[in-house]
């Protein structure tokens, strides 16, 4: 079965077309990447060793073309919007990673995603060797650095399990992207965008408790308290041990307070 690396970029295209009303088309967003593929093919010979081709691709993308992550504002939702990323050469690590995977597949280069717990990592496989690349800036990451990141997330002494550095399960990668996109929109209170995106995701996954939870959070921000209450109660009932459940229970108390205010207004 083919490991379809362009699919993560497809998720970005779908995301932007759902949330945006700026007239961008799927053909335009794919054409932008097609232009980069043509430029890369002019610069990278398929006759070179794979290591050299990978090195040159990273130099082109992060060096010559100037794609980067800005440490001051990389977390803003706009860094997931493809037109913004192409215009400003700036995005989140996952955005830039998706673009590198697209280029790698077009050039037949063995670069794959890793669902590392702390962030997306790129995995280059050449012969029997594996190297890891940070999509933030295209630099190589040592095993020691990966271990430091892991301990930073899970505590001193926590050890990376070998399977955590394998090629990503694509369905998990897509779910992780969808959650990141929802979180960014909700955090910035882009409520209409978030609601439309979640509604679209639920066309094929209507009972997903995380989509229902996030719809509830959006509805709460929009002031639709009874509907929000219903969604958040559903989530707590179905995912009581989820790490976010305690926060959601607090939200439920606040929502009930807001509903009671509306039911018994002060005179």
Swiss-Prot record:
SUPFAM superfamilies: TPR-like (SSF48452). Belongs to the UPF0162 family. This is UPF0162 protein HI_1558. It comes from Haemophilus influenzae (strain ATCC 51907 / DSM 11121 / KW20 / Rd).
